[in-house]
């Protein structure tokens, strides 16, 4: 069994990104700029935002975190986003989710300039993605594809099961696997006989948001298991959707939590911010 080390791969890719950024600054005078807007004081969101800021600075980017109270009105938040849309120094805009109940997530995602939507969640970018002309790709699935590439995991002709159907992970993950010529099935919380279905898959990507949901009864010997889940157990420990100790006994490759998919998500956000900066100069 091989552990897919997303943290180490992220460090490797971000070192290469820092070199590209330095060359971009030297040759064209461009510095990628990433702004992250954090609404409220959700502890998990604060951790994610700190990690994004740290990665942006390490890559040589201009970075800013805008913290606003969770009492901010929807219109004021939309106005704030528009200010960064109009500022050419910023090439990537992220609004950390989740948002307070009085703010429409849909309106916020629509407000971000598609050219600066490095999360790839604006309908314009989604449309380009689904039509086979991607510009911004949702970062978690993009990071998983980089893992497959780094570890030389063959996808063509393989049977892949994606457990989870979100617009952020499940659906785009299935599309990227299809594009790589895998045969893909999407399952979810209402899928019947899920363990039986999962045992037929060569590759299982789990993004269902339930701690330790997938046990070794779901996984055939030698399968590749990618765990996107980030949950807390009763003691506050970070755990994935996969029961790692069990499943690692039968999987050929597996991602840990933490240190698997999470660091790669942030790495791909940085890559897409760099690419947005390059496109802005054309």
Swiss-Prot record:
InterPro entries listed in its UniProt record: Aminoacid_DH-like_N_sf (IPR046346), NAD(P)-bd_dom_sf (IPR036291), THF_DH/CycHdrlase (IPR000672), THF_DH/CycHdrlase_cat_dom (IPR020630), THF_DH/CycHdrlase_CS (IPR020867), THF_DH/CycHdrlase_NAD-bd_dom (IPR020631)
Provenance organism: Streptococcus suis (strain 98HAH33)
Pathway: One-carbon metabolism; tetrahydrofolate interconversion
Catalysed reaction, written as an equation: (6R)-5,10-methylene-5,6,7,8-tetrahydrofolate + NADP(+) = (6R)-5,10-methenyltetrahydrofolate + NADPH; (6R)-5,10-methenyltetrahydrofolate + H2O = (6R)-10-formyltetrahydrofolate + H(+)
Subunit structure: Homodimer.
SUPFAM superfamilies xref list: Aminoacid dehydrogenase-like, N-terminal domain (SSF53223), NAD(P)-binding Rossmann-fold domains (SSF51735)
Keywords from the UniProt entry: Amino-acid biosynthesis, Histidine biosynthesis, Hydrolase, Methionine biosynthesis, Multifunctional enzyme, NADP, One-carbon metabolism, Oxidoreductase, Purine biosynthesis
Enzyme Commission code(s) on record: 1.5.1.5, 3.5.4.9
Chain ranges passing through the membrane: none
Keyword Hydrolase: yes
Binding site for NADP(+): 164-166, 189
Task performed by this protein: Catalyzes the oxidation of 5,10-methylenetetrahydrofolate to 5,10-methenyltetrahydrofolate and then the hydrolysis of 5,10-methenyltetrahydrofolate to 10-formyltetrahydrofolate.
Cellular component terms (Gene Ontology): cytosol
Name of the protein: Bifunctional protein FolD
One BP annotation, GO: L-histidine biosynthetic process
GO molecular function: methenyltetrahydrofolate cyclohydrolase activity; methylenetetrahydrofolate dehydrogenase (NADP+) activity
One Pfam family linked to the record: THF_DHG_CYH_C
Family to which the UniProt record says this protein belongs: Belongs to the tetrahydrofolate dehydrogenase/cyclohydrolase family.
């Amino acid at each position: 069994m091989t552990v897919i080390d997303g943290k180490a791969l992220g460090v490797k890719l971000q070192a290469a990104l820092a070199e590209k950024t330095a060359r971009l600054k030297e040759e064209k005078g461009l510095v990628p700029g990433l702004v992250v807007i954090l609404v409220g004081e959700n502890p998990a969101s604060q951790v994610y935002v700190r990690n994004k800021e740290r990665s942006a600075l390490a890559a040589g980017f201009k970075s800013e975190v805008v913290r606003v109270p969770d009492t901010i009105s929807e219109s004021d938040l939309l106005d704030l986003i528009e200010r960064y849309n109009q500022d050419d120094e910023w090439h990537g805009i992220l609004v950390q989710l989740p948002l307070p109940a009085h703010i429409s997530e849909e309106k916020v995602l629509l407000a971000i300039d598609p050219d600066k939507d490095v999360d790839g969640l604006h309908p314009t970018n989604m449309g380009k993605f689904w039509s086979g002309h991607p510009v911004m790709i949702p970062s978690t699935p993009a990071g998983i594809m980089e893992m497959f590439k780094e570890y030389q995991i063959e996808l063509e002709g393989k049977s892949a099961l994606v457990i989870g159907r979100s617009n952020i992970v499940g659906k785009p993950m299935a599309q990227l696997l299809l594009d790589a010529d895998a045969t893909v099935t999407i399952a979810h919380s209402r899928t019947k006989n899920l363990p039986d279905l999962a045992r037929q898959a060569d590759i299982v990507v789990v993004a269902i948001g339930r701690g330790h949901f997938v046990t070794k009864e779901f996984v055939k010997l030698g399968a590749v298991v990618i765990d996107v889940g980030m949950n807390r157990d009763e003691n506050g420990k970070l755990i994935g959707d996969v029961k790692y100790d069990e499943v690692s006994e039968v999987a050929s490759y597996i991602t840990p939590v933490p240190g698997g998919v999470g660091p790669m998500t942030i790495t791909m956000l940085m890559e897409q911010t760099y690419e947005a900066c390059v496109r802005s100069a054309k």
